[in-house]
From Swiss-Prot:
The chain crosses the membrane at residues 8-26. Residues 1-7 are extracellular. This is Septation ring formation regulator EzrA. The keyword GTP-binding does not apply.
C-alpha cells in the first residue's frame, strides 16, 4: 500500500471521527435544552392554578367580578387543555429529530417550544395575579367595611346628639344619612352575593359621601348661629337705629328707602336659610357676606347723616356772623383803597375785585337764608345741607384770603416806596463817588462809551427821583426803574473798575518798558503806539494790551507780574 493511500485513509478516519464528535456534541446540547424544557413544563404544570381557581369558584362571584373570573378561568382551560398538549407534541418532535441526528431541525423545534413555554408562563402568571386580585379585593372589602361603618355610625351619633345645633337643616341631614345607609346596604348585598369589585366601588362612594357630610355638618352650626341669631340680632339693632333716626327727624336722601332695604335684607336672610338646607354652603357664605355689606352700607348712611348734622349745627350758627365779618372787611378795604389812591396809582384792579366780593357776599347771604330755612323746616338731608354749608364757608374763606392779600398789597406800598427812595439816594451817592474816583486818576480824558454809560445811569436815577416825587406814585413804574437802575449801576461799576485798572497799569507798564526803549526799536515803537492810544485816543484798554504785548517781546511774564502786584496792593474803591 502506497503512502498516498495511507494518508488518504488517515484523513478520512480523522474526518469521520470529527463528524462523529460534532454529532454527539450537537445531540447533547439539544438534549440538554429538551430536558430544560421538560423541567419548565413540569414546574408550570405543578403550579396550584387549578386549586386557586377552585377556591375562587367557592366564593360564588356575580356581576362584574364573575365576568372577570370567567375570563381568567377560560384562559386557564385553554392553557391546560390545548397549550400543554401542543407543547408536549413539540417537545416529542424535537426529541425524535435529535435522536435521528436532524440537528438543525431539532434546534428549530426546541426554539419554537421555548418561545411557546415563555408565552404560557406569562399567561399563567397573569391568570394567577388576576385571581389573586379578586381574592384580595374580597379581603379589602371585609377590612374596609368596618372602618367605613364606624365613620358612618360616629357621624349619625354626632348628628343625633347635637340635633339642636342644626336647626331646620336636621331633616335634610337625616335624608343624606338615609341615602348613605342605603349605599352601605347595597354594598353588603353585592359583597355577600359575590361581586367584590362592584361592591368596592359602592363602598368607596358611601365612604366619600360620609366624609363629605361630616365636613358639611362641621360648618352648619356656625352658619345656623349666624342665620338664626347673629344676623337677626343685627337686623333688629339696625331697625332700632332706623327708628331712632326717624324719631330724631332726620331726612334721608331720595335714593335711600329704609323699608325697602330692610325688606331686602330679610329676603337675603330667608334665601341663606333655604340655601343652607340645600347644603349650598358656598352660596350661603356669599349671601351672608352680601347681608353684611348691605348692613354696613346702611350704618354708613346713618353715620354720614349724623356727622353731617354735627357739621351743620357747628357751622350754620356762625354763617351770618361770618358774612357780616367779611362784609365789614370789604367796607374797610374800600375805604383803605380810596385813601391809598390819593397817593398811589393802583394797577391791579383792586377796587373792582372788592366790589365783586360785595356782590358775591350778597349772593352767599341769600344762600345762607335758604339753608337756615331748610334747617329749621327739616325738609332736607343733613348730608346735602352740610355740603351747601361747606360750600358757603369755603367761598367766604376764599374771599377773606383775597381781602387779606389786597390789604397786604396796600400796606406794602409805603414800604416799597421807602425802599425805592433809599435805593435812589444810594445810587445818587455812588454816582458822585464814582465821579470823584475817576477824577483822582488824572486821566487825559474819558472814552465816549463810558461817558454815555455814566450819564445814562445818572438819567435813570434822576427819573427814579422824579417818579418818587409825583403826587400819585405808580409803584409798578418805580419798581421797574429800580430794577433798571440797579442793572445800570452794576454795569457802570464794572466799566469804571476796568477803565481805571487798565489806565493805571498802562502807565506803569510804559514806565517799566522805557528801560528797553533805547536798545530795542520794537519796544520804542510799541511805547509810542501805547502812548498814542492812551493820550490821544483815550483807549486805555487798547493801550494796556499794546504795551503788554511789547513787554512780552523783551521780558516774557513782566506784564503779568506787574499786574499781579498792582491787584494785590490795590485798595477797594469807595463805590464798591
Amino acid at each position: 500500500m502506497s503512502s498516498t493511500v495511507i494518508i488518504l485513509i488517515v484523513v478520512l478516519l480523522v474526518i469521520l471521527v470529527a463528524f462523529y464528535a460534532f454529532a454527539i456534541l450537537m445531540r447533547k446540547k439539544t438534549e440538554d435544552r429538551i430536558l430544560a424544557l421538560e423541567e419548565r413544563k413540569e414546574s408550570l404544570f405543578d403550579l396550584p392554578v387549578q386549586e386557586e381557581i377552585d377556591s375562587v369558584k367557592k366564593m360564588h362571584l356575580v356581576g362584574q367580578s364573575q365576568t372577570i373570573f370567567r375570563e381568567w378561568n377560560q384562559k386557564w382551560l385553554d392553557l391546560s387543555s390545548n397549550s400543554f398538549a401542543d407543547l408536549e407534541e413539540h417537545i416529542f418532535e424535537a426529541e425524535q429529530l435529535n435522536d435521528s441526528f436532524h440537528f438543525f431541525r431539532a434546534r428549530e423545534s426546541v426554539a419554537d417550544s421555548e418561545a411557546q413555554i415563555e408565552l404560557m408562563e406569562g399567561d399563567v402568571e397573569g391568570i394567577r395575579q388576576g385571581v389573586a386580585q379578586l381574592v384580595e379585593q374580597e379581603k379589602r372589602n371585609s377590612n374596609k367595611i368596618q372602618e367605613s361603618l364606624d365613620l358612618y355610625d360616629n357621624l349619625r351619633s354626632d348628628i343625633a346628639d347635637n340635633a339642636d345645633l342644626y336647626g331646620t337643616v336636621i331633616t335634610e341631614l337625616e335624608k343624606h344619612l338615609a341615602n348613605i345607609e342605603t349605599e352601605f346596604s347595597q354594598f353588603v348585598t353585592l359583597n355577600s352575593t359575590g361581586d367584590p369589585i362592584e361592591a368596592a366601588e359602592v363602598l368607596e362612594t358611601a365612604e366619600e359621601h360620609t366624609i363629605a357630610l361630616r365636613a358639611i355638618t362641621e360648618q352648619i352650626p356656625s352658619f345656623i348661629k349666624t342665620i338664626e341669631k347673629d344676623v337677626p340680632k343685627r337686623l333688629e339693632e339696625l331697625q332700632e337705629a332706623s327708628d331712632k333716626f326717624v324719631a330724631e327727624e332726620y331726612i334721608l336722601p331720595d335714593n335711600v328707602n329704609i323699608k325697602e332695604r330692610m325688606d331686602d335684607l330679610h329676603d337675603h336672610l330667608v334665601e341663606s336659610s333655604s340655601l343652607l338646607e340645600q347644603f349650598e354652603l358656598d352660596r350661603v357664605e356669599a349671601e351672608l357676606g352680601l347681608i353684611q355689606e348691605k348692613v354696613e352700607e346702611l350704618y354708613a348712611i346713618f353715620e354720614r347723616e349724623y356727622s353731617a348734622r354735627r357739621n351743620v349745627e357747628k357751622r350754620s350758627s356762625v354763617l351770618k356772623e361770618y358774612i357780616e365779618h367779611i362784609r365789614a372787611n370789604n367796607k374797610n378795604l374800600l375805604l383803605e383803597i380810596d385813601h391809598v389812591t390819593q397817593a398811589y396809582i393802583l394797577s391791579g384792579n383792586e377796587k373792582g375785585y372788592v366790589r365783586g366780593y360785595q356782590e358775591h357776599l350778597e349772593s352767599l347771604d341769600s344762600d345762607v337764608d335758604e339753608i337756615l330755612g331748610n334747617i329749621q323746616a327739616k325738609t332736607m338731608p343733613y348730608s346735602i345741607l352740610s355740603r351747601r354749608v361747606n360750600s358757603v364757608v369755603n367761598a367766604l374763606e376764599d374771599i377773606e384770603k383775597n381781602q387779606i392779600k389786597i390789604s397786604d398789597t396796600l400796606t406794602g406800598l409805603r414800604d416799597e416806596e421807602r425802599a425805592a427812595q433809599e435805593i435812589a439816594e444810594r445810587f445818587d451817592s455812588e454816582l458822585r463817588t464814582i465821579k470823584r474816583y475817576v477824577e483822582k486818576c488824572n486821566l487825559p480824558g474819558l472814552p465816549k462809551d463810558y461817558l454815555d454809560l455814566f450819564f445814562t445811569t445818572g438819567d435813570r436815577v434822576q427819573n427814579l427821583f422824579k417818579e418818587l416825587g409825583r403826587v400819585r406814585i405808580n409803584i409798578d413804574t418805580i419798581n421797574h426803574l429800580v430794577d433798571v437802575s440797579t442793572e445800570d449801576m452794576h454795569v457802570l461799576k464794572e466799566a469804571t473798575t476796568n477803565l481805571t485798572d487798565h489806565a493805571v497799569l498802562a502807565e506803569q507798564l510804559i514806565q517799566y518798558a522805557n528801560r528797553y526803549k533805547a536798545a530795542n526799536e520794537q519796544v520804542a515803537q510799541g511805547i509810542s503806539r501805547a502812548l498814542q492810544l492812551f493820550e490821544n485816543s483815550r483807549d486805555y484798554d487798547g493801550s494796556f494790551d499794546e504795551i503788554s504785548k511789547t513787554l512780552e517781546l523783551v521780558e516774557p511774564g513782566a506784564a503779568s507780574r506787574i499786574s499781579g502786584v498792582y491787584f494785590k496792593n490795590k485798595p477797594t474803591p469807595d463805590y464798591l
